[in-house]
Amino acid sequence: MVEAIATKADAGVRQIYADLLSQAITGELVGMRNYAALVGLMPDVGSQIAVMHHASAELRHAENFGSVARTCGLEPIVNPDARHWRRVRNAFVRHAEHGDLTACLIIQEIMLEAMAVALYSELGALPDERIARIFAATAREEADHVSDGLDHLARAAQRDPAEFADKVEAIHDEVMVAIADMLAGEEGPSEHCGLCAGSCVKQALPELGLDRSRLRGRAMRQYLEALDALGVPGERSLAWVARLPI
C-alpha cells in the first residue's frame, strides 16, 4: 500500500527524498556490478562465493530503497551510467581488466563503502522515519563490508607500505575526485549529475535538516579512518583529501 509522504510536504520536499533515493539505488547497483566483476579475480571458490554474497547484498539494498520509494509514492531515477557514477565504474572496470584485485578492493571496499557508511548514517536521521530506517539499517550492513575490505587489504599494505600508499594515491586521484564531485557545490545545467529530476538537490538539503558540508565532512572522515587503519601515513592522506573538490 502506498503511503505518500505527508500531504503537508510540498512537491519540492518530495523531490528531495526522491533524488536522495535515486543516488542510493544507483550507487548500490554500481556496487553490485563491481562485486560481481570481482569473481574472476578471486583466487579460490570461497572468496568467489564471498564476493557474490556481497553483490547480492548490494542488490538487496537497492531493492529495499526502491521499495520504500514506492511505499512513499516517490519515483526515483535509476541510472548506473549517470555522470559521476559512470566515472567511478569506468575506473573500476579498467583495473579489473588489468587483473588488479588490490586496486578494485580499494575502490569498492574502501572508497565506495566508506562513503556509503558515512552518508547513510547521516541520512538515517531524515524526518520521514520510513526512509530513515532503511538508510540506517543499510549503513550498519555496509559497515561490515568495510571491515571485510580492511582484512583483505591489510596484507597488501603490510607487504610494501610505500608501494601500497602510492597505489591508493593514484586511485584516489581518479575515483575520489569523482565521489567528491557528487558532494561538491551545486552543479550547473551543463554539469547535471543525471539523477536529480530537476536542479541539483544539494542546495535543497537544509529543507530536510541536512547540511552538505557536514555530509562531506563525515564522508571524508570515514575515508581517512579506513586509510589510517591500513597504515597509510596521515600526512599523505590528509594532503590527498585537501585537494579534492569542495
Where does each model-flagged region fall?
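Non-heme di-metal
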Residues: 1-246
